[in-house]
Amino acid sequence: MATYKTASELTKMMIDYLGQRGMEVWRNNNLAVKGRAFIGRKGVPDIIGYDRKHGQFVGCEIKKLGDRISPEQFTFLTQLGLAGGASMLCSQTSDETIKLEIFKDGETKIFSWRESEKEFRQT
């Protein structure tokens, strides 16, 4: 059974999970700073990196319970998946459920987190 996780906890969980599966990934801090103009691209995922074996770009957006994906984030993930990258959306949808959606090559696969196994399983 999953318990409520913060965005930071979900991010760490996904960085560890993807790293164990051959991905070189890191947190992409893309936050606005008070008093400074935003310099960057809107919609870039919270976690970015690449597959060590194939060199494929990987992007994973994290959403804690109650958060929603922005139009810019949706567009970025869609374009990444259509361009041959692996785009992911990891979201906690209830206190018990963490869902991972992977969009790659025009196809979406949905997985659920198994806390006891520390593993996602396709649903």
Indicate residue ranges for each PLM-predicted region.
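Catalytic phosphate/metal-binding cores of nucleic-acid and nucleotide-processing enzymes, i.e., regions
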Residues: 1-123
